[in-house]
């Protein structure tokens, strides 16, 4: 009938990935070494509630520039509905996104000194980076999300979830 109603509602999306994976390896060359961890997930839908808030067009919140592409006149071709109070707050499949990703989770690069100093039997310097890069088509900050950073009971909902922190650690190991 051209009107959205409660009868049009259905379950959409599945937050469970088809599979998850990880790859770890270490490489050595002379006194240098590198440890590597890559993780990922294939499939699994994410409801991007952050986008929902930014594209709702129903209150006085700041809006994303995507709402400039909203439907305004008959004949417009767009996936952004017209701004009105009736349908702006309805959950829509346009906020469901593929949560697949590959993440460079951790890399450590180190050097073992062959001739430690007097009184030092072993000396190693290293740098480790974590959460270095994510390959994904997900439009949010990080596809590893759950609402309000809580339990898996709300898996697959991104409602202002902060991305995982990128960290760098510089270290020195010495045995005396």
Regions inferred by a protein language model and the residue ranges of each:
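Residues that define the transmembrane beta-barrel architecture of outer-membrane proteins
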Residues: 17-21, 100-105, 164-168
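Outer-membrane beta-barrel pore domains and translocons
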Residues: 28, 39-41, 128-132, 175
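C-terminal beta-signal and terminal closure region of outer-membrane beta-barrel proteins
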Residues: 64, 75-76, 136-176
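Conserved small-residue
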Residues: 1-15, 130-132, 137-140
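Repeated loop/turn-to-beta-strand initiation elements of outer-membrane beta-barrel proteins
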Residues: 31-36, 116-117
